[in-house]
Amino acid sequence: MGPLWLDVAGYELSAEDREILQHPTVGGVILFGRNYHDNQQLLALNKAIRQAAKRPILIGVDQEGGRVQRFREGFSRIPPAQYYARAENGVELAEQGGWLMAAELIAHDVDLSFAPVLDMGFACKAIGNRAFGEDVQTVLKHSSAFLRGMKAVGMATTGKHFPGHGAVIADSHLETPYDERETIAQDMAIFRAQIEAGVLDAMMPAHVVYPHYDAQPASGSSYWLKQVLREELGFKGIVFSDDLSMEGAAVMGGPVERSHQALVAGCDMILMCNKREAAVEVLDNLPIMVVPQATALLKKQQFSYSELKRLDRWQQASANMQRLIEQFSV
């Protein structure tokens, strides 16, 4: 599979989608709420994506929970990460949440949810209650449980947004945030610990500039991705860019420049979403590349949604997540 992830417009593939998915540089499709009508339609869409690609291809979605849950009707509701630490049995619930989220996606032939968020603190507009906590130990304890749940059912894990997005106020979807702190050691401690624990299969860097360290956003910085992530922290998994169509990546230039910089800096796979013309421009201008190690991120189990819903574990987890949402939602 190639390095580029892109999106499709609707519930079914268009003729253009089918053609573009055969391009050797395409390695993944990220789905959005607009791609989901019901459970059977989603299964049919994912089957069509895999058939059109004619080779292994990754299918992913942002389904971490709370406001970032693309598939809702017909799926269990997953709470925002912040809620787990507020509950008495929060660690147990976080593991159930990770398992439930991953299991329901796998039952619909989705390989990945880009999760969990390992950022610390609730102040950032882009992160907020997507964070597990405001201190290192709270984030580590509950994210570790969430990761265990994901892995137990066969889904690869993605830590984000390296080296820490939680302390900036600005939203990288809308602008390039600058983290002016002289040290981000506390934020980094979370990523370091999870890398050392061997529980992260992939990493997604932030579209954030940390000027005391490097002038480029982490997503396009060889300092962060090669020197720190690979060499200092010893991370061996796949590195995804965040969506390069976000305004946070604009400091790297146009679509082709952003993609080239991210790949040269150390990203293995890049996301270009919601701008088909930009994705086509990237495909037309990037050299043909393959990322054979990315096949390790394909889902490890296969089962139907009806089989899953018969499990006591599913019934308990789904009910517990709903109760947690009702308990803490204002």
Swiss-Prot record:
Pathway: Cell wall biogenesis; peptidoglycan recycling. The record marks D171 as: Important for catalytic activity. It is found in: Cytoplasm. Pfam families: Glyco_hydro_3 (PF00933). It is an enzyme of class 3 (hydrolase). GO terms for biological process: carbohydrate metabolic process; cell division; cell wall organization; peptidoglycan biosynthetic process; peptidoglycan turnover; regulation of cell shape. InterPro entries: Beta_hexosaminidase_bac (IPR022956), Glyco_hydro_3_AS (IPR019800), Glyco_hydro_3_N (IPR001764), Glyco_hydro_3_N_sf (IPR036962), Glycoside_hydrolase_SF (IPR017853), NagZ_Beta-hexosaminidase (IPR050226). Keywords: Cell cycle, Cell division, Cell shape, Cell wall biogenesis/degradation, Cytoplasm, Glycosidase, Hydrolase, Peptidoglycan synthesis. It catalyses: Hydrolysis of terminal non-reducing N-acetyl-D-hexosamine residues in N-acetyl-beta-D-hexosaminides. It comes from the Bacteria. The active site is at H173 (proton donor/acceptor), D242 (nucleophile). GO terms for molecular function: beta-N-acetylhexosaminidase activity. Plays a role in peptidoglycan recycling by cleaving the terminal beta-1,4-linked N-acetylglucosamine (GlcNAc) from peptide-linked peptidoglycan fragments, giving rise to free GlcNAc, anhydro-N-acetylmuramic acid and anhydro-N-acetylmuramic acid-linked peptides. Belongs to the glycosyl hydrolase 3 family. NagZ subfamily. This is Beta-hexosaminidase.
